[in-house]
């Protein structure tokens, strides 16, 4: 008969009527008992032939595709004009005096941030916007393009103009090398005297693979073709005299044909070959329309007219317009032809827009390195969208980048630090990631974009194939007309108006600020905010400022004090160029909500919504049905978060961990489920540790244990020899139960680490409950007063050590009040084990 829940609780010593601990506890280390209990509770799984359950409540397998819901009415969030001051270190020094080495190093990391992937894989532009919502393809396309456009306008993205240049909005940094008159025209006043145009430009620039006529032409008259590369400074200076009137597809060597007259004759042959050439940069003059074609190789190629003053006579050259504007002159093919839509407006605006600033960038191909799509901003805000960027190529495969590790405060450190009687408020940094500037050298690796509406629709619709597109004949133009597209565009026309034209063009953008989809970004953000908080803490030594990623909290003794601190800190952060969202400032009173915990003077507990999730999970948890191990990962993730607040802690979840590790299904027996249910029904706060002097010591040998409690010594023997770690753990449990002390000295590193998951399962669960809230101090064996009793010698007394205990705040570098001068090295080595210094959650 399976083990009843009551009996199981008695075995685990969770009920009062258990016998003396010295007899009962060693029994739990017995392998035979652990095996029998595991069999009774169905914890060691036979290979089950019953089909696995792949969904429990809201938990599906880790790799399942939960289909995100598309919202046609998503609003694109607005981004403030974020510009972090470049001399942020000087500004901080004016505020607080000289910065420490640590703070400077962290701030220098993000001014500017750099990104060096091992290798970068380039993807075709068609993959730029992921077809995540097959029923809302067109709507999603325009919403995403609008989001990208918004980011570009806010100075968060660069727009690739040519292979070697990009434009952006917002204020430039000193490391962004501006291109003055070299690659861009300043308007009609300089048309005659325009400097050499970047002709290898355009959206899809490739090395020329011109037609035979054109290549013969070039070889005979112009000498060898010069390579496509931007002008270096010296050439650029001299290039003023060269009139690059006609945008020839390949660059001519300097000095040949300085005027535009001679090659007017060969425009015809050249325009034929142009169709195969890399595109000429569109819209140097936005008032001229451009035309998009699909060359035989499937690349969109765009042309624009040349102003009459810049070349011979324009009449000899065919006039092309862009894909969108071509509909204006064509006959409607049906009631749902795009011609009807395009004729609604006289002026559809420019084909492209350029930023205020143009900079030179490393060679950037006309490709992307990651796809984008939209999702809800967060579970509580489904009205606004959030852009998801998939740069996962940098985290995969043999060339993956191993991102730097950084310290995340664990629960005990957090409680030691923040559990106090302070008043709290938390600040909301708006678009925190987009504060940190990236060096332009990273642009070629972090590219997003889209191939333009015509190709996007053609790729996704089954009836229209991109076949005979290079001649741009009428049927091909109307291939994309369909009722769905027409209806979608008509609805979108209400939202976006003439922007539909701009958004239907192809575009490539690179990140100017750190994107969220790269593993480097969380590290950089954590470094940045922790450095800023360190500065704030030194400026206001009587207060506490603390951050984890973009979550910044301030604490002060009284509410009035907190408000004045809030004003000062807000002004300081704004002076650095950090944007706060005042509507989202939360005042917590004395119990702070932070990182999923509620932290008050009594300690920490999980937030209410997590407790509700756990209750919900247990309500839906099936009994006696094998659950897919991927679903178990989800369940363990949730239960593991709240495990430190339960009686038995992490050890209670060990059977689940074991099944995940062996990739087996797990079956909950009624007793095990009831045990976990009861565990998570009553949560106990994790209290802050107090400093103190250690008076109680424990030690053990495989055969016996010994305690030193003040001047009293005790010893005992085990029924059978035990592994040394198990014996030491038992001795610590006896010390706690006999003395009630919350501070125990031990010489065993495993006991110190307070991870009881590697012990026999029943013992781990019971020991976790007995030792809950106990702090350990490391004492070397040679100095341990309990060493002699554990070896059976009671007569010999070692003097009691005065071992002070100082609670750790972890390696989160939060509270280390930064000294103004570096401190000298310690005189002597202290015996703090590494396990002790870096506290793990209890």
UniProtKB/Swiss-Prot annotation:
Feature type site, description Priming of reverse-transcription by covalently linking the first nucleotide of the (-)DNA: 63
Biological processes, Gene Ontology terms: DNA replication; symbiont-mediated suppression of host innate immune response
Residue spans of biased composition, Polar residues class: 223-239
Reverse transcriptase domain location: 356-599
Residue span of region Polymerase/reverse transcriptase domain (RT): 346-689
Key words, A-Z: DNA replication, DNA-binding, DNA-directed DNA polymerase, Endonuclease, Host-virus interaction, Hydrolase, Inhibition of host innate immune response by virus, Inhibition of host RLR pathway by virus, Magnesium, Metal-binding, Multifunctional enzyme, Nuclease, Nucleotidyltransferase, RNA-directed DNA polymerase, Transferase, Viral immunoevasion
Region called Terminal protein domain (TP), residue ranges: 1-177
TM annotation in the entry: none
Catalytic activity: DNA(n) + a 2'-deoxyribonucleoside 5'-triphosphate = DNA(n+1) + diphosphate; Endonucleolytic cleavage to 5'-phosphomonoester
Comment block on domains: Terminal protein domain (TP) is hepadnavirus-specific. Spacer domain is highly variable and separates the TP and RT domains. Polymerase/reverse-transcriptase domain (RT) and ribonuclease H domain (RH) are similar to retrovirus reverse transcriptase/RNase H.
Additional detail: Hepadnaviral virions contain probably just one P protein molecule per particle.
Protein name, per record: Protein P
Organism: Hepatitis B virus genotype E (isolate Chimpanzee/Ch195/1999) (HBV-E)
């Amino acid at each position: 008969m399976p083990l009843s829940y009551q009996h199981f609780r008695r075995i685990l010593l969770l009920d009062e009527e258990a016998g003396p601990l010295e007899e009962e506890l060693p029994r739990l280390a017995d392998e035979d008992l652990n095996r029998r209990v595991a069999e009774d509770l169905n914890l060691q799984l036979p290979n089950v032939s019953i089909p696995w359950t792949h969904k429990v409540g809201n938990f599906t397998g880790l790799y399942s595709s939960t289909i995100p819901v598309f919202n046609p009415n998503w609003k694109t969030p607005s981004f403030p004009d974020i510009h972090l001051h470049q001399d942020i270190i000087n500004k901080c020094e004016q505020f607080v005096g000289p910065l420490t080495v640590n703070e400077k190093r962290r701030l220098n990391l993000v001014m500017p941030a750099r990104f060096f992937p091992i290798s970068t894989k380039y993807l075709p532009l068609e993959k730029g916007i992921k077809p995540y919502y097959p029923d809302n393809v067109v709507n999603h396309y325009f919403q995403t393009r609008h989001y990208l456009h918004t980011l570009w306008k806010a100075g968060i993205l660069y727009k690739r103009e040519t292979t070697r240049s990009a434009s952006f909005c917002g204020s430039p940094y000193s490391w962004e090398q501006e291109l003055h008159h070299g690659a861009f025209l300043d308007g009609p006043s300089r048309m005659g005297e325009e400097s050499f145009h970047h002709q290898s430009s355009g959206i899809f620039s490739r090395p020329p693979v011109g037609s035979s006529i054109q290549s013969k032409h070039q070889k005979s008259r112009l000498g060898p073709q010069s390579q496509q590369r931007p002008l270096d400074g010296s050439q650029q200076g001299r290039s003023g005299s060269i009139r690059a009137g006609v945008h020839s597809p390949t660059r001519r060597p300097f000095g040949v044909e300085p005027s535009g007259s001679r090659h007017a004759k060969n425009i015809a042959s050249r325009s034929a070959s142009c169709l195969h050439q890399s595109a000429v940069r569109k819209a140097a003059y936005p008032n001229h329309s451009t035309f998009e074609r699909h060359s035989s190789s499937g690349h969109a190629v765009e042309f624009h007219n040349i102003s009459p003053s810049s070349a011979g006579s324009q009449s000899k050259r065919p006039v092309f317009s862009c894909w969108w504007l071509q509909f204006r002159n064509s006959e409607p093919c049906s009631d749902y032809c795009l011609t009807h839509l395009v004729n609604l407006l006289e002026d559809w605006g420019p084909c492209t827009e350029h930023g205020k600033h143009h900079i030179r960038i490393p060679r950037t191909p006309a490709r992307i390195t990651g796809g984008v799509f939209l999702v809800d901003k967060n579970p509580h805000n489904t009205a606004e969208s959030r852009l998801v960027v998939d740069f996962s190529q940098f985290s995969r495969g043999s060339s993956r980048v191993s991102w730097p590790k950084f310290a995340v405060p664990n629960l005990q450190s957090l409680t030691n630090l923040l559990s106090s009687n302070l008043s709290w408020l938390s600040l909301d940094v708006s678009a925190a990631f987009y504060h940190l500037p990236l060096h332009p050298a990273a642009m070629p690796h972090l590219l997003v974009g889209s191939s333009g509406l015509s190709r996007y629709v053609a790729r996704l619709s089954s009836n229209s194939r991109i076949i005979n597109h290079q001649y741009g004949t009428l049927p091909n133009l109307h291939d994309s007309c369909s009722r769905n597209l027409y209806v979608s565009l008509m609805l979108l026309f209400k939202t976006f108006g003439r922007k539909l034209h701009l958004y239907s063009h192809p575009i490539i953008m690179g990140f100017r600020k750190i994107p969220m989809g790269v593993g480097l970004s969380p590290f950089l953000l954590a470094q940045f905010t922790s450095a800023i908080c360190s500065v704030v803490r030194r400026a206001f030594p009587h207060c506490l400022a603390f951050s984890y990623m973009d979550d910044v909290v301030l604490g002060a003794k009284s509410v009035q004090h907190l408000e004045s601190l809030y004003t000062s800190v807000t002004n300081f952060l704004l002076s650095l160029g950090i944007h706060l969202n005042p509507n989202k400032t939360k005042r917590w009173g004395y119990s702070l909500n932070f990182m999923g915990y509620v932290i008050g003077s009594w300690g920490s507990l999980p937030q209410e919504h997590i407790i509700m999730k756990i209750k919900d999970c247990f309500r839906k948890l099936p009994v006696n049905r094998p659950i897919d191990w991927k679903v178990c990962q989800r369940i363990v993730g949730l239960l593991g978060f709240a495990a430190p607040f339960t009686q038995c802690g992490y050890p209670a979840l060990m059977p689940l961990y074991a099944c995940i590790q062996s990739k087996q299904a797990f079956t909950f027996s009624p007793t095990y489920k009831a045990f976990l249910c009861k565990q998570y029904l009553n949560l106990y706060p994790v209290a802050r540790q107090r400093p103190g002097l250690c008076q109680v010591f424990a030690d053990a040998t495989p055969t016996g244990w010994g305690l030193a409690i003040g001047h009293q010594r005790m010893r005992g023997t085990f029924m059978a020899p035990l592994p040394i770690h198990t014996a030491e753990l038992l001795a610590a449990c006896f010390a706690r139960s006999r003395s009630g002390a919350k501070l125990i000295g031990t010489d065993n590193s495993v006991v110190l680490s307070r991870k009881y998951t590697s012990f026999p399962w029943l013992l781990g669960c019971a020991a976790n409950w007995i030792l809950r809230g106990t702090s350990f101090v490391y004492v070397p064996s040679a100095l341990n007063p309990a060493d002699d009793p554990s070896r059976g010698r009671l007569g010999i007394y070692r003097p009691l050590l005065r071992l002070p205990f100082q609670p750790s705040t972890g390696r989160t570098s939060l509270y280390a009040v930064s000294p103004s001068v570096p401190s000298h090295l310690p005189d002597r080595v202290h015996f703090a084990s590494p396990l002790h210094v870096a506290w793990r959650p209890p």
